[in-house]
Swiss-Prot record:
<protein>
    <recommendedName>
        <fullName>Movement protein</fullName>
    </recommendedName>
</protein>
<feature type="coiled-coil region">
    <location>
        <begin position="297"/>
        <end position="327"/>
    </location>
</feature>
<dbReference type="GO" id="GO:0044219">
    <property type="term" value="C:host cell plasmodesma"/>
</dbReference>
<dbReference type="Pfam" id="PF01107">
    <property type="entry name" value="MP"/>
</dbReference>
<keyword id="KW-0945">Host-virus interaction</keyword>
<comment type="similarity">
    <text>Belongs to the caulimoviridae movement protein family.</text>
</comment>
<dbReference type="InterPro" id="IPR028919">
    <property type="entry name" value="Viral_movement"/>
</dbReference>
<keyword id="KW-1031">Host cell junction</keyword>
<keyword id="KW-0916">Viral movement protein</keyword>
<comment type="subunit">
    <text>Homotrimer, through the coiled-coil domain. Interacts with VAP. May interact (via N-terminus) with host prenylated Rab acceptor protein 1D (PRA1D).</text>
</comment>
<dbReference type="InterPro" id="IPR051596">
    <property type="entry name" value="Caulimoviridae_Movement"/>
</dbReference>
<comment type="function">
    <text>Transports viral genome to neighboring plant cells directly through plasmosdesmata, without any budding. The movement protein allows efficient cell to cell propagation, by bypassing the host cell wall barrier. Acts by forming tubules structures that increase the size exclusion limit (SEL) of plasmodesmata, thereby allowing viral ribonucleocapsids to spread directly to neighboring cells.</text>
</comment>
<dbReference type="GO" id="GO:0046740">
    <property type="term" value="P:transport of virus in host, cell to cell"/>
</dbReference>
<keyword id="KW-0813">Transport</keyword>
<keyword id="KW-0175">Coiled coil</keyword>
């Protein structure tokens, strides 16, 4: 199936109709950008683990009906693979770790989707983040001690520890520094803060090297991602979460995102299972009444027993006081 409608674009475009591949290039005084898009038809041979539930193993049905059901519930896996490249110069005033650079935005994704046929475009619901390669290049001579720290974070996550996707520390004394981060997760296109999912933070430590208004370095980044109609459409290669190019091993180091330690907490199994809960996605209403819970939460009957026991103890204490007072 051809994902792309026939239309003219103002940007420089080359298209291989046989392979369903498009390349867009644009270059202005602000910088250079390039985009590569490949349709799913070119990558049918990629092996994927299928999540299926066979209706024939649940219901007894005639062979003819079985075939009709298979056809009725079949779903085409739509995947649009994208590689986006951008380059921009950074003012030394903006290289102090106080600002962030969004590496993928809703506007960019909408631009990619606009090239699809309407019947395909309206099915796209997820973006899968595969890899981000970042190259920093100095705009000054080699040999100047210029340490730099870079972090790629998911700024939607509130915890500063958990938001880290990867961090690197290097030096631009040799003119350039490069590393690659592999996020390897998918998000809904309707998530509220999509632009903050891939946020690049950079801290240039030699802040007195130049004055405000001077461009200190160039950031060039490549983002590989896929737009799909399902969260189950993509499998990722088993790369590390972050890699440092071999040539930069001696002048830099990296920090991977941490995987949490799962606690086997047998004491906290309380969950609200009351009826009349609100529908997922619907506006919630204030619920009046008692909630029913399972787990290690005291039930109403055990509470009543405890109150009865306390009352009994009070009566015994009252009788004891009467004996002491000679009443």
């Amino acid at each position: 199936m051809d994902l792309y409608p026939e239309e003219n674009t103002q940007s420089e475009q080359s298209q291989n109709s046989e392979n369903n591949m498009q390349i867009f290039k644009s270059e202005t005084s602000d910088g250079f950008s390039s985009d590569l898009k490949i349709s799913n038809d070119q990558l049918k041979n990629i092996s994927k683990t299928q999540l299926t539930l066979e209706k024939e193993k649940i219901f007894k049905m005639p062979n003819v009906l079985s075939q009709v059901m298979k056809k009725a519930f079949s779903r085409k896996n739509e995947i649009l693979y994208c590689v986006s490249t951008k380059e921009l110069s950074v003012d030394i005033h903006d290289a102090t770790g106080k600002v962030y650079l969004p590496l993928i935005t809703k506007e960019e994704i909408n631009k990619r989707l606009s090239s699809l046929k309407p019947e395909v475009r309206r099915t796209m619901s997820m973006v899968h983040l595969g890899a981000v390669k970042i190259l920093l290049k100095a705009q000054f001579r080699n040999g100047i001690d210029t340490p730099i720290k870079i972090a790629l974070i998911d700024d939607r996550i509130n915890s500063r520890r958990d938001c880290l996707l990867g961090a690197a520390k290097g030096n631009l004394a040799y003119g350039k520094f490069m590393f690659t981060v592999y996020p390897k997760f998918g998000i809904s296109l309707n998530t509220q803060r999509l632009n903050q999912t891939l946020s690049l933070i950079h801290d240039f430590e030699n802040k007195n090297l130049m004055n405000k208004g001077d461009k200190v370095m160039t950031i060039t980044y490549i983002v590989g991602y896929a737009l799909t109609n399902s969260h189950h459409s993509i499998d990722y290669q088993s790369n590390a979460t972050i890699e440092l190019e071999d040539v930069f091993q001696e002048i830099g180091n990296i920090q991977q995102s941490e995987f949490c330690t799962i606690q086997n907490d047998e004491c906290n199994w309380a969950i609200d299972i009351a009826q009349n809960k609100a529908l997922l996605g619907a506006k919630t209403k204030t619920q009046i009444g008692n909630s029913l819970q399972i787990g290690n939460i005291a039930s109403s009957s055990s509470t009543e027993n405890e109150l009865a026991r306390v009352s009994q103890n009070i009566d015994l204490l009252k009788n004891k006081l009467k004996e002491i007072c000679g009443e």
